[in-house]
């Protein structure tokens, strides 16, 4: 499955919220250099996450659960892709039409993205 969306600025809460959980997320995803920042991608229609793994808030002293789906993010200008995860909390602050994407690189910098840039993601069955 492929999703296409537009990059937009987030509120910065994910980086602060995910930093203490980063070692758990890295272990569960096998992405050893995963960065705590997320890239917000707005879709034209809602997407219901199909979690690859979940970190339950009750197990890490949090009020919400953290759901993750493995994906790849495509840099169409340079014909390459980065493995990553889509993160969504159980409270789903942004709604189903925004994805928060994490990767082992800063996606904005590495892919030369700005607000309004188009991004393609591939999801695995």
PLM ranges: what are they?
Residues 1-95, 115, 119-121:
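Long, compositionally biased stretches
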Residues 97-103:
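Active-site scaffold segments
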Residues 103-109:
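Short alpha-helix capping/helix-loop boundary micro-motifs
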Residues 110-114:
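A short glycine-leucine-enriched loop at secondary-structure breakpoints
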Residues 123-125:
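Short, charged beta-turn/beta-strand-edge "cap" motif at the junction between a beta-strand
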């Amino acid at each position: 499955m492929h999703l296409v969306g537009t990059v937009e600025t987030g509120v910065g809460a994910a980086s602060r919220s995910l930093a203490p959980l980063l070692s758990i997320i890295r272990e569960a995803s096998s992405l050893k250099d995963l960065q705590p920042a997320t890239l917000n991608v707005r879709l034209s229609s809602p997407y219901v996450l199909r979690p690859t793994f979940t970190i339950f808030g009750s197990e890490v002293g949090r009020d919400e659960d953290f759901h993750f789906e493995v994906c790849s993010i495509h840099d169409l200008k340079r014909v390459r892709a980065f493995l990553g995860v889509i993160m969504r909390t159980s409270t789903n602050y942004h709604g189903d039409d925004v994805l928060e994407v994490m990767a082992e690189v800063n996606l904005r910098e590495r892919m030369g993205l700005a607000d309004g840039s188009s991004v393609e993601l591939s999801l695995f069955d």
